[in-house]
Amino acid sequence: MMPSTSLSRADTGPSAALARWRSHLQAKLGGPLDLPPLSPAAGAIAAMAADPDANTALLAEHVQRDPTIAANVLRVANSAAFAPQVPILSLQQAISWLGMSEILSISVSVWVRAQVFSVRGHEKLLSAFWHESVATACWAREIARQSRTSVELAHLCGLLQRIGRPVVVSLLADIASGESSRLTSVERARLVEEFERRAGLALAAAWTLPEPVVATIARRGTTDPSGDWSLQLRQVRLAELLAARMLEQSLDASATEQLAQALDALNIYPEQFAALEARADAVQAALSALV
């Protein structure tokens, strides 16, 4: 992990303390970061999500190279969400039962959670972030499936769109524990929101993530995306709104309007949206298996 850094106690005012935390983050993000490495197997699996020529034999080979990924793929494959008719004891069985698309998504998800969404003392916050990320990824899959576009790529973009948030939490936790009481939960949330894009792009560069994933991180919040990867940006935007609604986060009038705009951007008609909403139970089951 990153070396501990103490802040001076000279400034006791809330605004001065927040300014020092902000300065600390800027300094950290301005230099080399001690980020969790992407294992060769995980990197290859992530790249396969953006490769239309990927095949199941190669996927099985990569999964077998990482015991953590392999064990968790089997765990999820045997969960109630995927309802296997008989116990799944091998990766070949898992791929045959679930298909390459599901195995790709499960593999990336379990690895990302283990490496990034684990900061001691911040389990509750990171659990909430993880639920949001997985729910967004699962909805992105359904949106892509309906439009017959790459579900693997949609899942990856949805899962990693806000990967900068746990990175910022890790950086903040790196400051000496004696100073952490000076940062309130509101201030922490403010700093996470302010720096998540920059941190996410740093992680994307370190992991050499596929270009469409980098685009969804860099351009999150773009109201009318165009150009390269605009389809993935629009899919993930709609997925994020549907995830927020499913997780019972409040959707005010503004968010309801954003939902309508997101549907229009993808040319999704009312009957298509109704069919999409009918997949809510499947999304919830997939979410339960991955969290």
Task: Give the positions of each predicted feature.
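C-terminal appended segment following the main domain
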Residues: 244-291
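Conserved alpha-helical "signature site"
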Residues: 1-178, 183-258, 286
